[in-house]
């Protein structure tokens, strides 16, 4: 919608100004541990692990830390018996905005308590499993950065089995996001790379089926503070919400 920022745009704008620049070293390391535990501890044969390693390297995590995380996931790192669980939490923000939280935790009681406190202090509430997840579909999303020839992108998207794509141009950032089914993410990523597109990220993302417009300054401020509080928790890997915010309110609250 013209004049409003979708959730993906909101995330990009926030990360440009957040001191933590998105995910912390600990969060990225945990993603590597879980990926190595779920599949082969070799990135050449484990797409989830390969993607997690690429994100870690982009964030500046040293190779030594990456190798240690892989070893922990494979169970070959001495004196470490920590077991992380992947858990999805659900809740509501101010004005009934639906929020999904993906966490990696070694203590689900601690994580639930931290999330409940963050919600309650900022006008939301942590809900039961299933209360909002029906409002989202999980998709594979590939980020392309830089100038994009739309005709070439359309051709590559069809060849790779993409569902759709969206071009974006924000401030000095231009590029595209390409969407596909979860099971097709690796194939499409490879196709786009072979076609010489500048693929910088491939991830699984929850996409809202419909979005709520936020035009009230106080609601916008409260929502963004809640998102910040949730993202700052060590156990939280990703936060997704189903609101769009008026661009002038977005700039006023992230500047």
Curated annotation (Swiss-Prot):
Biological process per Gene Ontology, one example term: regulation of DNA-templated transcription
Pfam families in UniProt: TACO1_YebC_N, Transcrip_reg
Keywords: Cytoplasm, DNA-binding, Transcription, Transcription regulation
GO cellular component: cytosol
Location in the cell: Cytoplasm
A GO molecular-function annotation: DNA binding
Membrane-spanning ranges: none
Family named by the database record: Belongs to the TACO1 family.
UniProt name for this protein: Probable transcriptional regulatory protein PCC8801_2028
Organism: Rippkaea orientalis (strain PCC 8801 / RF-1) (Cyanothece sp. (strain PCC 8801))
């Amino acid at each position: 919608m013209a004049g409003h920022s979708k959730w993906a745009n909101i995330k990009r704008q926030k990360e440009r100004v957040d001191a933590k620049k998105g995910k912390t070293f600990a969060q990225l390391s945990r993603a590597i541990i879980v990926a190595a535990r779920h599949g082969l501890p070799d990135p050449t044969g484990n797409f989830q692990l390969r993607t997690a390693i690429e994100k870690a390297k982009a964030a500046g995590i040293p190779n030594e830390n990456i190798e240690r995380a892989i070893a922990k996931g494979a169970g070959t790192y001495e004196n470490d018996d920590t077991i992380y669980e992947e858990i999805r939490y659900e809740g509501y923000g101010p004005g009934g905005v639906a929020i999904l939280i993906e966490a990696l935790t070694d203590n689900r009681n601690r994580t639930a308590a931290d999330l409940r406190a963050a919600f309650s202090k900022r006008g939301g509430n942590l809900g039961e499993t299933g209360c909002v997840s029906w409002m989202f579909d999980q998709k594979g999303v590939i980020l392309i950065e830089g100038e994009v020839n739309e005709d070439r992108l359309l051709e590559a998207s069809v060849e790779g089995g993409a569902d759709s794509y969206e071009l974006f141009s924000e401030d000095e950032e231009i590029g595209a996001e390409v969407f596909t089914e979860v099971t097709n993410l690796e194939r499409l990523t490879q196709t786009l790379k072979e076609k010489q597109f500048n693929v910088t990220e491939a991830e699984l993302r929850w996409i809202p089926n419909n979005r709520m417009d936020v035009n009230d300054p106080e609601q916008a401020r409260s929502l963004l503070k809640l998102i910040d509080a949730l993202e700052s928790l060590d156990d939280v890997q990703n936060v997704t919400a189903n609101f769009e915010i008026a661009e002038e309110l977005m700039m006023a609250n992230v500047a």
